Amino acid sequence: MKFFVSCAKGLEYLLADELSALGLEKATATIAGVNAEGELEQALRIVMWSRLASRVLWPIDAFECPDEQALYDGVRALPWHEHIKPEMTLAVDAHVSGDKITHARFAAQRIKDAIVDRMRDEGLERPSVNTDLPDVRVNLSLRKGRASLSIDLGGGSLHRRGWRGAAHEAPLKENLAAALLLRAQWPRLHAAGGGLLDPMCGSGTLLIEGALMAADVAPGLMRHGSLPPSRWLGFDKAAWKAIQSEARDREAAGLAALKPVIHGSDIDPTAIQAARENAEVAGVAHAIRFTRADVADLAAPEQEIGAVVCNPPYDERLAADPALYRALGNALQKAVPQWRASLLCGNDELAFATGLRAGKKYQMFNGALECALIICDPIAVPGRDPAQPRELSEGAQMVANRLRKNLKKFKSWRAREDITCFRAYDADLPEYAAAIDVYEEDGGQRRTFLHVQEYAAPAAIPENDVRRRRNELLAAAREVFGVPPEQVSMKSRERGKGGSKYGRFEQRDEFIVVRENNALLQVNLFDYLDTGLFLDHRPLRRMMAEQALGKRFLNLFCYTGVASVQAAVAGAASTTSVDLSATYLQWCYDNLALNGQGGNQHLLVQADAMAWLEGDRGQYDVIFCDPPTFSNSARADDFDVQREQLKLLRAAVARLAPGGVLYFSNNFRRFKLEENAIAEFAQCREITARTIGPDFERNARIHRAWELKRLG
């Protein structure tokens, strides 16, 4: 059976690894969770043992749901007497997206109404509603007009361990705490005799979770006690009892062997008292030493190796003071220089303030707050005085300040639209003339890469000044984003030798996977001038994907096929991708395969797009045409978009099905559309403003775009 295990964003790949370790043969990371496949007993084992999951959702039905009446009818059609008894209590959680049903509470209420009405149809009493502790919790996911109904096997969020009492300010959810511990490699270090330290421990969440992890205590034991987590009629009570019995045996052995190698301190006595009380309830107080101390007075533990895990203050209620982060970094370098640190910082600027060199950085979310998790191993870099912060030159500091300003400006937009690849800087300071694009890896090590494109400097600028400014810009970018040199690609936008538009740069042949508009994509940041993903077209691709459901999609001059892939993921009936380059078509094929989009409905055509259009007789509902400005391939006629626009657009419009739309775009800055001639065969309107994202507003001429429809 296929089922879904949800988690906080940023934990997906850790969760997939955890589920594999729990015995699942198929566990594939996706947005905010993992698509799993296994038996009910395995799903119940996840409820008991997962430290990272939020919910385990066991499907009971799925159906097309174009509107609220279809939702009600689909739910009412189910035999609910097979899932819940009249005397039981019920709760419904709903997650909706789309333009037909937009309110989750309304959807949940309609589901409750349908369940109650179906029970009455069966001559049964209606079950009561209990949103806090229901006997059965039903979950709805409504996406792209399709409703999926599941039983929440855990009965609620699995981050609750059952030990938390008095919570101090800004408590960390336990499953996020587990992620910090796993990124710190705490299980490995504990097995090797290492210690665990949190110098700003608050109410003790990280240390208590670390102690339970070290003692092999199942997260679900205290949460559920002796009762099953759900009274759903399909729940396997015998399997749960066996899982519970095994967990109790492992808990007894683990707690008996747990040694006092865990250290926590905080300047707030109230926090220390809350931490001690929580540790007592969790049964691990004997393993944790809590002390009241300022971070500046941090003492060195007796263990030679170990992990530091810390969640310094950064939310709106607790002022995020860079000086506090600097004090934390200095204290760690002095007390535990050879340990490994996993620090959850509020943002890149605060991570930079620690003065620590991060080997890896991950994007995570503490509730709605986007955070930067930095991994430092070792904490202190040999040969560097920990008391001396890395200083930037005056020019580099200007660039760094502008980058931080831009990141702050983009933060809410990026969170709202799930943007992980974007332009952070575009010659904002004229003397530092370059574009800096950020690519956040999806999966793998979840590294952050920078793609820096330096614009050609005027001949009057001395070469020494060009080199100095380039180095200052790179230094600022690396500091702000906390990336090592090998994750920075530096290129010049000058014309290649021999007039070639695309010159070969490094020979790394290194692809990373990123995500845009719900699609996974391969990019190559080092080998070519362009990366395989034109970031400026992001809004236009999203627009087309939103229209693609059940449609026939044609992508002319398709490049690496990103628009085709996103249309396929969005539910296009078919995609046709045309390009003269076999390299790009293979790239497109790989991108489709990466998203599980194969089959004859996704056609790849190696051909000159102009010639192919003249011979094709197919009809398409959505066409994307993004031609190059110039092309002089040996296998096709020379192409000039200004000269060939009428021929190209006439042929493309002729392939539109009734009601179809053609999106035409190009980045030739001196391009002039022949509007009067086009008006003879198409309705045409410019939509450029709708296709420029916030990160390209500084360079609104990056491209232009039009929407064309057949006359009549």
Swiss-Prot record:
Where would one find coiled-coil regions in this protein?
none
SUPFAM superfamilies in UniProt: S-adenosyl-L-methionine-dependent methyltransferases
Molecular function GO terms recorded: 23S rRNA (guanine(2445)-N(2))-methyltransferase activity; RNA binding; rRNA (guanine-N7-)-methyltransferase activity
Work out whether the entry's keyword set contains S-adenosyl-L-methionine: yes
Looking at the record's lineage, which domain of life comes first?
Answer: Bacteria
User: What is the recorded name of this protein?
Assistant: Ribosomal RNA large subunit methyltransferase K/L
Question: What exactly does this protein do?
Answer: Specifically methylates the guanine in position 2445 (m2G2445) and the guanine in position 2069 (m7G2069) of 23S rRNA.
Gene that this polypeptide is encoded by: rlmL
Q: Which UniProt keywords apply?
A: Cytoplasm, Methyltransferase, RNA-binding, rRNA processing, S-adenosyl-L-methionine, Transferase
Checking PROSITE patterns in the record gives: THUMP, UPF0020
What EC number(s) does its UniProt record assign? 2.1.1.173, 2.1.1.264
UniProt-annotated location(s): Cytoplasm
Question: What are the residue boundaries of the THUMP domain, all occurrences included?
Answer: 42-153
Q: List the GO terms this entry assigns under cellular component, sorted alphabetically.
A: cytoplasm
Q: Name one Pfam family in it.
A: THUMP
The reactions it catalyses are: guanosine(2445) in 23S rRNA + S-adenosyl-L-methionine = N(2)-methylguanosine(2445) in 23S rRNA + S-adenosyl-L-homocysteine + H(+); guanosine(2069) in 23S rRNA + S-adenosyl-L-methionine = N(2)-methylguanosine(2069) in 23S rRNA + S-adenosyl-L-homocysteine + H(+)
Organism of this sequence:
Stenotrophomonas maltophilia (strain R551-3)
Q: State the similarity comment.
A: Belongs to the methyltransferase superfamily. RlmKL family.
